């Protein structure tokens, strides 16, 4: 009996090993990892700049599509736009699932966000509502809030220019609340810190393989005080931030509505448009969730883009001078331009905004798609439930498409006559995601950066800091290495271009 049992176990092991070997031969190439269940490439996963490691692995294995298995989670990496387009765009119905993360969705409470909702009717309903209001056609209805935030940013920079980073974060947050809920935001409002905390947690938890609980969901039942359960303590703090980010502005808007003091906003307009004969609780839940999308985009990604714009102007003063020459030709020196002709009247500034989203790729790996059924691509098996990461950093730093990709060069998008060159790939598509899961806030984000850039360079020369002898100090163009990418902290000076504009803006 014992011999029979041992034989059966041995036969099972041999069968498992052979089946695994046969299946692995059908998968895309990738690093071998440790051939044990729930281990695989877990210890290969980079915690910093994973997009660089994935690109290097692609070169090592001579492929633009990689397979990894991190703790039982199957991962596909796409390193070229061709592969990304073939799968995420052309086969979008199969690749529109989303990461179902125990850490992010359950423990941190991000189930409200479109980026983490499972593909289905709820996702379609919420995305349809948000995308309609924030489409390219409708985005101008929010321009007053964008201009107001840009002008207020200038006033804050005149008073305390050394706090420029905090001022950007505050004004982008204030704009988001104005658009989403029609409410004001004090400079020291705790909502800002809560939003920043929630977004920082999301950035850390979104790195592939960053928390074991995503591979072993049963770990979520561990007591938070237990050694090794630090992830639960982190999740608790991050969830408090996310809950405050979602609920505070919505409840404030509702109170103002009852008092008759609410200003027009996305949320108030949606509430007024609710079907009185429908499920009111459900309709309000959809409005609450979609209004939060304005905060999520403004709370981190737009702040990163505006900060990168300032960094680029400091590092590339010749670009700054050319933008200012374009602005001055449209109006006069020190006069903030009319924003009705965003793309046509200031093509070089528009090219700068395109280059910002390429040069400072905010989400280098985007948010992963999940395959809803087995697929075959180029003869490779792409397994059901695999997480599919598009390496946008690789796409936007492709030297064949963007020569000298580490350099900030807006002119790459313009022809010799200074007009947009349609033959150059617009980087904003890759910067804002792919297929049915692309970011519906793209038009709000890019117009916010455009207006902020035009306003800042109309009023200021943005210059390098100086040492004790008045000599300019060079600053490096360095960026964070987490899932969401930002410029590392740096110093700069905001020097008013004319006394007249200084008096005008201050007044």
Curated annotation (Swiss-Prot):
Biotech use, per record: The pharmaceutical interesting psilocybin as a treatment option against depression and anxiety is being investigated in advanced clinical trials.
UniProt entry keywords in alphabetical sequence: Heme, Iron, Metal-binding, Monooxygenase, Oxidoreductase, Signal
Residues given in the record as heme binding sites: 439
GO biological process: psilocybin biosynthetic process
Names of required cofactors: heme
Chain intervals with Basic and acidic residues compositional bias: 408-425
GO molecular function: heme binding; iron ion binding; oxidoreductase activity, acting on paired donors, with incorporation or reduction of molecular oxygen; tryptamine 4-monooxygenase activity
CDD domains per record: CYP64-like
Entries under Pfam families matching the protein: p450
Region (Disordered): 403-425
Entry's EC annotation: 1.14.99.59
PROSITE patterns xref list: CYTOCHROME_P450 (PS00086)
Annotated function: Tryptamine 4-monooxygenase; part of the gene cluster that mediates the biosynthesis of psilocybin, a psychotropic tryptamine-derived natural product. The first step in the pathway is the decarboxylation of L-tryptophan to tryptamine by the decarboxylase psiD. PsiD does not decarboxylate phenylalanine, tyrosine, or 5-hydroxy- L -tryptophan (5-HTP). 4-hydroxy-L-tryptophan is accepted as substrate by psiD as well. The cytochrome P450 monooxygenase psiH then converts tryptamine to 4-hydroxytryptamine.
Family recorded in the similarity comment: Belongs to the cytochrome P450 family.
UniProt protein name: Tryptamine 4-monooxygenase
Taxonomic lineage from the root: Eukaryota, Fungi, Dikarya, Basidiomycota, Agaricomycotina
Underlying gene: psiH
